[in-house]
Every structure is written in C-alpha cells, then in structure tokens.
C-alpha cells in the first residue's frame, strides 16, 4: 500500500481553499449575459470554447492532491446542480466559493464549525421559502422564450425555438438537441409516436420521391415474436383485405414467406401493407409494444396472454389516422386508443420514473412518457464551424433545462437579484448561539456574490450595483447587465427559474458546509521516480 500524506487544521483548509478558488475563478468568468468564454484544450482536435460552467468545472484537474480535493468538491456542486436543475451551475459555484471563504475565516478565528454549519443551514431554509413565496407562475409563451434567452446568454433565437418546442410538445414531451449539418438552426416537431425502426423491405414504399411508406387510416398488427409462417398470418390478411384498409405489421422480425407474401401482394396492388421490426429489446420491447397497443386501441399479440396469431380478429388490431414509415423511423399519428387508457398508462410510467434509481432507466421511461403524452421536438443547432456549433449546443442544452424548470416551479427576477432580495427572510431567524448567528451572516454576505460577479463580468463595479439595488425594496427591481439599465426585471424579460436558483443555493451550501467542517485531509504521497541506471562506459561490450 502506498504511503499517505495527512494534513490537519488550518494547513488542510488553506490547501483546500486554494483548490476551490482555482476552480471557481475559472468557472465564474462565464456568469451573466456578458460572461466571458473559456477555452478548453483537447488532446485531439480543435480546442473547445464554452460559456457553460459545468463544462469548465469538469475539465479542471489540479496537480496538488490536496488542492485537487477542494476543487473536486466544488465541481460536485456544479455537477449536482446540473443534474437536478440543468442550469445554474456557475451561480452555485460562485455561492459555494463565497460561503467557503467566509466560513474558513470564521473557523480560523476560533468559531465552532458545526454551529456555523447549523446557522448556514437555517439561513438557506429561510431563503428557499422566501424564493418560493415570491415565485411567479409561467403561463405565456413569451415568458418561456425569455427564460430560454437568459439561460442561453442572451441568444434570442434559442429562446424562441425553445418556446415553440415547449408549446408544441408540452412539458411532458421530449426535446432533443442535435448538431445540424448546415449553418442554420432549425426545429423539427414529430407529432404522434415515433420509434427508430424502418421498413423491412424497400418494396413497401408508396412515395418513391421521399422513399417512404404512407398508410392512411391503417390497421396495426402488434406481435411480440418473429413472424415466418404464412399460414398463421393468412386469416388476418384476408380480414384486412376485405375491409379495404392498409395494414402495418410490427413484430420482433418478419422473414421468409411471411415477408415475401405481403411484398408480392403490395407489388400486385392487392393490399397496401408494410412491416417493421418492434422497437427496443427484451422487457423494454414488451413495454413499448404495450404502449403502441394502448395508443392505437389494439392488443399486443403475445403468447403470454394465450392469444394465437391464427385466432386474431380485426377488433384486436390497432387503428391510427396515419402511419409514415421511413428507412430508419416509423411515426404513428393520432392513434385510436381511448383517452382514459392512455392516461392510465401515463400515470403508471410516471410512478415507475419516481421509483427507479437508474438514470438510464429514468431516461428511457421519460422517452416512453413523451411518446404517449406529448411528442418529440428536435432542435438542430447550426453554426459556421464545429467549435461554434459545440459552444452553441452547450447553451441550448442549458436553456432547454431552464425552460423546463421554469414551467415546473415558476420564475423569479434574474441577474442574481432574487437572492439579494430574499435576504430579508434572514431577519426573522431567532437563535441565541453566536456562532450560528455568524453562519447566518455568512449566507447574507454570500447572497451578494452572484450580482457582484455578473456586474464585474459586464465591466461594472459590483459594490456600486449592489448599493443601488439596496436603495429600492421592490422584489422585481434590478440591474439588466445586457442593457446596463435599472428597472423591473420582469418587464425586461430578465427572469430565472425558481428551481435553478433554489438548487444552486442548496447544493452550494451543502458542499460548503462539508468543506468548513473538514479538519483533516489524507492523500497519497507523490511517488519519486527511481534514478536511471548509469550510462554504459565507452568500449563496453553487451
């Protein structure tokens, strides 16, 4: 086992604080509409330019093990805030640095770290309640656009695209962000349910120009297993032919004569038909087929239910207004399933999302929920160069999460003003313990940090801006760094989601509390490289 180095008390905290400062100073330059860029070196390809706090934080790795521990703790603040709220990572980092700095000074002067932490926790709880009390619900589309614009560092186009996406797919819908192949940013909305499986044979194509199958008011045969035997399929095919409607077969696979016969039928013009593979794998495939069945009002044909293919009747098949099958995607528009059954299925998936502990499972369940309840919107981010596209995509990701959070819990005045105004909630906290009182004061001072940093990044003097804001008492009155004007931030469209502000403060205080109460640090001693062997002398034979 390698030897360890141990640091105690002030020595440990100083090292840790240096690491916190290095990471926080690199991250906080990105805060606000006039935030600066950070260039990240990549071992391959061009350097990456970003204004995204968590992306910068993830790149910082320090040589000194003790300093690195401090930096990694603050990186955890940024990552956790990003995971929960999707934005506010830079604000969380700035708050954590401010609380840790003041807290370390207090501990060095002989105060009790545990009481300081209790005071900080009390203050944070009071501030969070104050923020929730002053929240405004988001109802209008232009308010969603404002949140997106602020989060995307003042990019109005991104805000507009996000508002349009939320309007079309709802808050349950999935919004995905991809890199475009062109310089133009565009939004594509997929109505209905789409899954990533295309036609099994190009002979099914009905629209040769676009190379896709378009079926109007088709029946859907949803089968869990492989289809290879034509005899079992014949009764269903005959019933569908008599009805005069098209047919879409969704099965694990369709092969042999079960595929050849529909192809021949289609070519002879007897029956409009298409076959696709079922989406997903294993248990997830079963669940997705059940989703399709509920959406279209059909039955998922499964041997588990004791239903044989030869006994299937027309009323067991699903119905939809339209189905479009492309080379790699199938879209079912306006399924004929009953509203109550779809809502029941949605509630069931929501319950599974609450219960699951796996991030991967949660993501897949969210996708299924969106396909049933909302729709799918794809924002394709364009730019002149790869570096620009990546930087813009980072901002679109942030803005997307911020708009979701705004619809969930409402909004507050932006620009760090909400935290500054919420300070009055600290006046009502009663405690006899002097160290706890100091913990509350630490939070009071730290809440100014975001406003100061936004001002400094915009080239203004932080203390003057804070002083002017203190002169007015209205909750929405603040400073717009983009236009360098004072006024009502709600009217100017400078707003932040409650969830983002709240999460940033809670995560910052949580990690700062741990750092303040740290008394010892243990790290592996750096290994000294063994000396190289002496060079062989001249004329020596080997």
From Swiss-Prot:
What SUPFAM superfamilies has UniProt attached to this entry?
A: GroEL apical domain-like, GroEL equatorial domain-like, GroEL-intermediate domain like
Please provide the record's keywords in A-Z order: ATP-binding, Chaperone, Cytoplasm, Isomerase, Nucleotide-binding, Plasmid
Task: Report which reactions are catalysed by this protein.
Answer: ATP + H2O + a folded polypeptide = ADP + phosphate + an unfolded polypeptide
Where does this protein hold ATP?
A: 30-33, 51, 87-91, 415, 496
Please give the GO cellular component terms listed in this UniProt entry.
Answer: cytoplasm
A Pfam family hit: Cpn60_TCP1
State the similarity comment.
Belongs to the chaperonin (HSP60) family.
Role summary = Together with its co-chaperonin GroES, plays an essential role in assisting protein folding. The GroEL-GroES system forms a nano-cage that allows encapsulation of the non-native substrate proteins and provides a physical environment optimized to promote and accelerate protein folding.
Q: What name has this protein been given in UniProt? A: Chaperonin GroEL 1
Q: Which gene encodes it?
A: groEL1
């Amino acid at each position: 086992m390698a030897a360890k180095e141990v640091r105690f008390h002030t020595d440990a905290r100083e090292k840790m604080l240096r690491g916190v400062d290095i990471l926080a100073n690199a991250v906080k330059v990105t805060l606000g509409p006039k935030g600066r860029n950070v260039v990240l070196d990549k071992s391959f390809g061009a350097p990456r330019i970003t204004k995204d706090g968590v992306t910068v934080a993830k790149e910082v790795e320090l040589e000194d093990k003790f300093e690195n521990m401090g930096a990694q703790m603050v990186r955890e603040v940024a990552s956790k805030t990003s995971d929960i709220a999707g934005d506010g990572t830079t604000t969380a980092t700035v708050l954590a640095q401010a609380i840790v700095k003041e807290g370390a000074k207090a501990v060095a002067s002989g105060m009790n770290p545990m009481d300081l932490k209790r005071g900080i926790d009390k203050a944070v709880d009071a501030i969070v309640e104050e923020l929730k009390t002053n929240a405004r619900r988001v109802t209008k589309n232009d308010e969603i656009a404002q949140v997106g614009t602020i989060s995307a560092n003042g990019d109005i186009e991104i805000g507009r695209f996000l508002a349009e996406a939320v309007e079309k797919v709802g808050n349950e819908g999935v919004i995905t962000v991809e890199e475009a192949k062109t310089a133009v940013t565009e939004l594509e909305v997929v109505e209905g349910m789409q899954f990533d499986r295309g036609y099994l044979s190009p002979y099914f194509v009905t629209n040769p120009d676009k190379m896709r199958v378009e079926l109007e008011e088709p029946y859907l045969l949803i089968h869990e297993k492989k289809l290879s035997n034509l005899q079992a399929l014949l009764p269903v095919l005959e019933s569908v032919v008599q009805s005069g409607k098209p047919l879409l077969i969704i099965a694990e696979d369709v092969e042999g004569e079960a595929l050849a016969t529909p192809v021949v039928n289609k070519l002879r013009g007897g029956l409009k038909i298409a076959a696709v593979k079922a989406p997903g794998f294993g248990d997830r495939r079963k669940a997705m087929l059940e989703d399709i069945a509920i959406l279209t009002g059909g039955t998922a044909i499964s041997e588990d239910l004791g239903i044989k293919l030869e006994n299937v009747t027309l009323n067991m098949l699903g119905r939809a207004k339209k189905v479009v099958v492309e080379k790699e995607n199938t879209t079912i528009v306006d399924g004929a399933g009953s509203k109550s059954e779809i809502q029941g299925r949605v509630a069931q998936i929501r319950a599974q999302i609450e219960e699951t502990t796996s991030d991967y499972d949660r993501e897949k369940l969210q996708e299924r929920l969106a396909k049933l309840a909302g729709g799918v919107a794809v924002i394709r981010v364009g730019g002149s160069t790869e570096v620009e596209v990546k930087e813009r995509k980072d901002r679109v990701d942030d803005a997307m999460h911020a708009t979701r959070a705004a619809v969930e819990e409402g909004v507050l005045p932006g620009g760090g003003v909400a935290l500054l105004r919420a300070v009055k909630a600290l006046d009502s906290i009663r405690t006899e313990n002097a160290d706890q009182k100091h913990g509350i004061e630490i939070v009071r001072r730290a809440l100014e940090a975001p406003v100061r940093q936004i001002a400094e990044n915009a080239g203004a003097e932080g203390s003057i801006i804070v002083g002017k804001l203190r002169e007015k008492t209205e909750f929405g009155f603040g400073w717009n760094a983009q236009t360098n004007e004072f006024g009502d931030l709600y009217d100017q469209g400078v707003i932040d989601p409650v969830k983002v502000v709240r999460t940033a403060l809670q995560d910052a205080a949580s990690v700062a509390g741990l750092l303040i109460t740290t008394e010892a640090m243990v790290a592996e001693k750096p290994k000294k490289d063994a000396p190289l062997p002496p060079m062989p002398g001249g004329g020596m034979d080997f």
